[in-house]
Amino acid sequence: MKTIKVVAAVICDNMKEKNKIFATARGYGELKGGWEFPGGKIEAGETPQEALKREIMEELDTEIKVGDLIDTIEYGYPTFHLSMDCFWAEVTAGHLELKEAEAAKWLTKDQLNSVAGLPADITLIEKIRRNMDN
């Protein structure tokens, strides 16, 4: 089975306090409408952090500061295996303009389970919730 290596940004309102997290609803493909943390594929020669900055600029017209790695999620979809490095991130410039997603929300810790997340992203939710307690 093919493995796809991707990165995801768990964009928070403030990396120290982490009161709200930004999530988007996928705007294309077979997983359209599923809620996820924005990001994308790592291109040849890129570090995960470089890929994440590029993807967020492409998808949201926004510059971010990439923080700590939260986790690497390994998830087997029916047609491929996903390996996803998930990082904390914070907006440094721009206004989170949706270029590929169909919707977006800022979610508090208690709202994280209120959207229909994609399976790989759901596995990350509890770890994010624990980090939002800090």
Each predicted region: which residue ranges?
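Short secondary-structure junctions
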Residues: 59-66
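Conserved hydrophobic "DFG−1" position in protein kinase catalytic cores
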Residues: 11-12, 23, 89-91, 106
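Conserved N-terminal beta-strand and adjoining loop/helix that marks the start
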Residues: 1-21
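Active-site-adjacent beta-strand/loop module that shapes the phosphate/pyrophosphate-binding cleft
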Residues: 63, 72-95, 103-105
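Conserved Nudix-box catalytic region and its N-terminal flanking loop in Nudix hydrolases
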Residues: 18-58
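NUDIX/MutT-family hydrolases
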Residues: 88, 97-128
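Hydrophobic packing within well-folded, soluble alpha/beta domains
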Residues: 48-57, 69, 87, 104
